[in-house]
């Protein structure tokens, strides 16, 4: 692993004064890209308010772990880009991180749903921040109240993997405090950083809190879980020291470690520390982590499960009712034997029950070359997104804010022809005629404007492969006319050519379902 940045206690004291209870979370090594596996977390010790709250929960854990009601928490996701719109990550990549987050929180019976589509913020001072102040401003200006605000941005200028705020410690104000900020390089779909940061956001300290600086200190968490040790041995203090959880073994390792660990450390009783690498709130490598403890899960639930809880405002607004996604979308076009024009390709599918958004992926040689989200049941690929005379395949799936883990349809192959034409219009330079709408449904007439009255106008409609569909002529009486196309036109893309008095115009049309 590349060199790490080590934060001293004095550093955290300075940061506390500067940031007002901001606890940084996940400092990267010099090689970005793999969530926590290549970077240390820099979150400081949990604030006193968090520790007091966790201590108050100790007697309630048995009842909490028997609570089987699911808690649904609202999320607002933000993608930060430069002021020119450069950089960032895709909306579908954010969906993948939320899907992964939900899978990791299943044992806690907590799920996260998106309240709306991902928000894009184009601001270079937030995108390439080299200090915390712009990010504090970002949160103050953009947080959506009563939701968990997650920001995805470029933190490489600060060598950070991400950071989060404990309850009641961050910017944003009443029922709006704090956020989770993730770097792009740490937002891998299978990474554990986001689960780790949500743990902090929901009141979980690191497993080594208050122990790593001096494992033999009397206030450090001891290994024993016996509350009635015989002197001179000291009894267990796991509910009032360390991370305040007695079902997470005492931990002393405050740097990234591979599992199993070969480090040897004794506590004040002379007992050997045996930290558990499987906990998300430890510093073990990503491939070691897989769970929260029952008491950790109970504490996170308690943090949101009543109006008076530290983040109880997250459950004040009833969650929306999302439809259940049934099956996968049935594809209409292209099918296995179909050929499409690469610069004018229309992809169509039937609506899927419960979906209000669709994700379309196109592959070449099993490589995903195109990935987009559309709110309708078709996508019109224009320009050079596809290459001519090639073999491709495609899949589509339905999504909604409550289910970002749905299955894709089976993959079907298709071919592309050569490019048929380019550009939206091909007009005679002096002819200013207009055709609208260019997106139409059955029965919609097309309006022709700025044509010459009294001069015959000839029109021809061809399909996406250049085949003639129908022709006709008009005798306009003034500078405008209505053109009624056949009502039985299949859904798809077309080319309308107009000719009048040595002038010519070509317009792309799209017949909608």
Where do the PLM segments sit?
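C-terminal outer-membrane/trafficking sorting elements
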Residues: 31, 391, 397, 426-513
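Active-site-proximal segment of zinc-dependent metalloprotease catalytic domains
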Residues: 137-214
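Conserved aromatic anchor
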Residues: 345-353
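Beta-strand-rich modules
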Residues: 386-402
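Residue-level detector of functionally pivotal "anchor" positions at catalytic/ligand-binding pockets or at interdomain
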Residues: 317-335, 415-436
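The catalytic-center signature of Zn2+-dependent metalloproteases
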Residues: 186-290
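Propeptide-to-catalytic entry region of secreted or membrane-anchored zinc metalloproteases
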Residues: 36-148, 152-157, 323
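Extracellular fibronectin type III
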Residues: 401-419
């Amino acid at each position: 692993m590349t060199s790490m940045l080590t934060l001293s206690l004095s550093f955290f004291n300075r940061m506390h004064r500067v940031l007002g209870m901001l606890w940084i979370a996940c400092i990267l090594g010099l090689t970005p890209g793999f969530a926590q596996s290549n970077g240390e977390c820099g979150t400081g010790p949990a604030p006193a308010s968090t520790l007091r709250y966790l201590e108050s929960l100790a007697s309630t854990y048995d009842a909490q772990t028997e609570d089987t009601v699911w808690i649904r928490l609202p999320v607002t996701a933000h993608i930060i880009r430069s002021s020119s719109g450069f950089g960032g990550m895709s909306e579908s990549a954010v969906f993948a991180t939320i899907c992964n987050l939900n899978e990791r929180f299943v044992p806690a019976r907590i799920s996260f749903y998106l309240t709306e589509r991902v928000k894009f913020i184009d601001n270079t001072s937030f995108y390439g921040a080299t200090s915390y102040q712009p990010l504090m401003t970002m949160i103050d200006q953009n947080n959506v109240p009563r939701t968990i605000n997650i920001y995805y941005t470029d933190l490489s200028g600060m060598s950070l993997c991400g950071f989060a705020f404990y309850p009641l410690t961050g910017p944003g104000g009443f029922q709006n405090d704090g956020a989770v900020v993730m770097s792009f390089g740490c937002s891998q779909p299978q990474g554990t950083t986001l689960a780790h940061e949500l743990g902090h956001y929901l009141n979980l300290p690191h497993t080594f809190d208050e122990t790593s600086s001096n494992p033999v200190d009397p206030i450090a968490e001891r290994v024993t879980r016996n509350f009635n040790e015989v002197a001179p041995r000291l009894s267990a203090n796991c509910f009032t020291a360390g991370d305040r959880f007695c079902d997470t073994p005492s931990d002393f390792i405050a740097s990234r470690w591979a599992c199993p660990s070969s480090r040897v450390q004794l506590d004040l009783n002379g007992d050997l520390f045996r930290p558990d690498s499987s906990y998300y709130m430890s510093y073990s490598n990503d491939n070691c982590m897989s769970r929260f403890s029952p008491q950790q899960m109970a504490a996170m639930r308690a943090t949101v499960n009543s109006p008076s809880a530290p983040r109880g405002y997250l459950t004040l607004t009833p969650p929306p009712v999302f439809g259940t996604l049934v099956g996968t979308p049935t594809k209409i076009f292209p099918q296995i034997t179909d050929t499409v024009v690469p610069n004018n390709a229309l992809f169509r599918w039937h609506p899927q029950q419960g979906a209000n958004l669709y994700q379309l992926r196109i592959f070449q040689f099993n490589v995903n070359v195109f990935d987009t989200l559309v709110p309708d049941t078709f996508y019109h690929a224009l320009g050079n997104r596809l290459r001519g005379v090639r073999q491709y395949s495609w899949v589509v799936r339905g999504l909604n804010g409550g289910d970002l883990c749905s299955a894709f349809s089976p993959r079907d192959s298709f071919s592309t022809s050569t490019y048929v034409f380019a550009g939206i219009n091909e007009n005679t330079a002096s002819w200013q005629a207009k055709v609208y709408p260019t997106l139409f449904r059955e029965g919609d007439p097309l309006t022709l404007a700025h044509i010459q009255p009294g001069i015959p106008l000839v029109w021809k409609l061809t399909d996406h492969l250049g085949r003639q569909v129908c022709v006709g002529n008009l005798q306009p009486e003034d500078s405008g006319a209505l053109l009624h196309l056949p009502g039985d036109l299949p859904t798809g893309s077309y080319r309308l050519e107009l000719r009048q008095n040595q002038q010519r115009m070509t317009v792309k049309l799209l017949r909608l379902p």
